[in-house]
Amino acid sequence: MTADASVFGTLARGSRAALERVANLGDGVTAAVWRNEHDEAHYSQPGHHTLSVYLQGGYTTHRQDLPNLFGAPGRVCMLPAEHESAWVIEQPMRFVHLYF
């Protein structure tokens, strides 16, 4: 994941998120563990799919257009390649992304 529009690139260069670890799993698949708090993230047609799983926290994390749906440990979110979304991250959270 190196493109500026990628979800990985947005988190790495355009947010307060901290990358804990990343691994190339082969066949165009990458996994990354992140932590974040007091931030916003905006994704616009990243060009790849992202499967996101909350590991810790995230109880107040939500999409700006869906303010009543929150994250929590074990919850899963799918971000399709051509989607657009804007996220509000208030309290500390830890999550894993699978990019493909």
Where are these regions (language model features)?
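N-terminal regulatory/effector-sensing and dimerization cores
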Residues: 20-100
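N-terminal presequences and immediately downstream first alpha-helices
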Residues: 1-15, 40-50
